[in-house]
Amino acid sequence: MVFNLATSQALRAVARTSVASRAQIMPSVIATPLSVRFLATPSSSSKPPPPSPSGSPASSKPAKAESTDDAQSQPQPQPPAEPELARKGSSLFDIDTSATPLASQLIEAEEAASRSDAGKGSTRAKAKTGARSMSSIERRRQNTVRILTGFVLIGAGLSAYKLGRPWESSAEAERFADSADAQTFVGRIKLRLNAMYDDYNKPLFEQLLPDPLPFPYSRPFTMVIDIDDLLVHSEWSREHGWRTAKRPGLDHFLGYLSQFYEIVLFTTQPFFTAGPIIEKLDPDRRFITYTLFRESCRTVDGKLVKDLNHLNRDLSKVVVVDTNPDSFHLHPENGILVKPWKGEREDRELIGLIPFFEAIGIYNIDDVRNTIKAYTGTHIPTEHARRTAAIRERELADNKARLERMGKFGSVFGRVSRSASAGLPADKTLYDLERERYLQAYLEEQKYWNENGDAIRKQAKDEQDRQIREMKINTWGFFTGGLKPQQPETPAQ
């Protein structure tokens, strides 16, 4: 009931607003944007403008009578409230509740309650910003994180101590003897970490190939050759899937040069992708002596490199043939770069390289690196053909001149001249004779395999099956040390 009385008093105070004040408010309402929610009005302390003198007295008399009736029906406002209204700005939503003492008491009680609530609210705000209660799962997670962090810090400290300890073996001391960081704690940590990374990037084994075979099974030179876009080219299509084609002249290239070179197929592919292709290239393993895969490479500056230092061969007798210069990045003097093959049928690059590698084998070059350096920046098949033709013409001219000199003494030393000229024809050089000999040996080997290849393969397959049968063993044989021989069955009486 008290609240209803205060509300009615407030509504009457709003209705008491003068007409002149409304006239002053209208321009500001029009000038204010429509998006503004609360409209500012002049301060309650400002006096309303005086009425216009042109106004009629009759219109002012009813206003005076109305204000007199309102003043008689409502009590006079409290004097102390006027300074407060003068300090605070008024708005359309300001309500003068100072008309009755009861309303003032209600307002004071409300303000006291609000102040007490504000104090409690500030305490609650502080409580909210402070530590909040945690569930058991969150508390367990927090404890777990703290424990794991402690273990990590302890492990990091122990690892740093172990890496920075003094050299314990003479091998480590000799390995890092030339380093300036070998005498400091942090320097030893750095050296050991770099050594671990270097050991991880090294090939799988220290020696990738076994020791060379004894004569006559060994070859004087070693050819390290890649497979991707050098010997074969693989492509994929929706109709056929993956298909692999051999480069023209591949069989002759491998078969003929295997007489001079120990052919090592070294690819950057893993075994499970390159193994089936190698089985198709050389099913009888007649030409390819060894195979090395991605596991035998190492990483240098983010590149896959074939490190010849781990090949267990004399580098003066090693030739690397590849389509990627990064493969022989550590040994560029041993590498020959070949144009990649993309499946062209008219390609003759491998056939053109055969005379160059053949000449190295026939002349038994002491250091192949000097020969490769002499052909740097040239197309080797074309340049070698030009140089070989010039050398052959010069040798043929020397042979002809020698035969002419020997012919002058034919009457005296006829038999000797005929025997000397019979061993070396006038139209052939020593290189031509050696080339014919190796070519004849290659043709004879091809003929032998064409005639006896099936029988040799069948014999190898039978031997493989026999070894597999001998390897089979059951559980009883594993515990008893072998299977007992079966006794022959005796016929029933």
UniProtKB/Swiss-Prot annotation:
Principal localisation: mitochondrion
For the keyword Mitochondrion, the answer is: yes
Q: Where in the cell is it found?
A: Mitochondrion inner membrane
Where are the annotated segments for Disordered? 40-86, 109-138
For this protein, the record's Pfam families field holds: NIF (PF03031)
Keyword Mitochondrion among record annotations: yes
Q: Which Gene3D superfamilies match?
A: HAD superfamily/HAD-like
Q: Where is the FCP1 homology domain?
A: 216-360
* Mitochondrial matrix-facing ranges: 40-146
Which segments does the topology annotation call Mitochondrial intermembrane? Answer: 164-493
TM region positions: 147-163
Any one GO CC term of this protein is: TIM23 mitochondrial import inner membrane translocase complex
Q: Show the InterPro entries listed in the entry.
A: FCP1_dom, HAD-like_sf, HAD_sf, TIM50
**Keywords linked to the UniProt accession:** Membrane, Mitochondrion, Mitochondrion inner membrane, Protein transport, Transit peptide, Translocation, Transmembrane, Transmembrane helix, Transport
Q: Where is the transit peptide?
A: 1-39
* Quaternary data: Component of the TIM23 complex, at least composed of TIM23, TIM17, TIM50 and TIM21. Interacts with preproteins in transit.
What does the function comment of this entry state?
Essential component of the TIM23 complex, a complex that mediates the translocation of transit peptide-containing proteins across the mitochondrial inner membrane. Required to direct preproteins in transit and direct them to the channel protein TIM23, and possibly facilitates transfer of the translocating proteins from the TOM complex to the TIM23 complex.
The UniProt family comment states:
Belongs to the TIM50 family.
Q: What is this protein called?
A: Mitochondrial import inner membrane translocase subunit TIM50
Q: Which organism is it from?
A: Mycosarcoma maydis (Corn smut fungus)
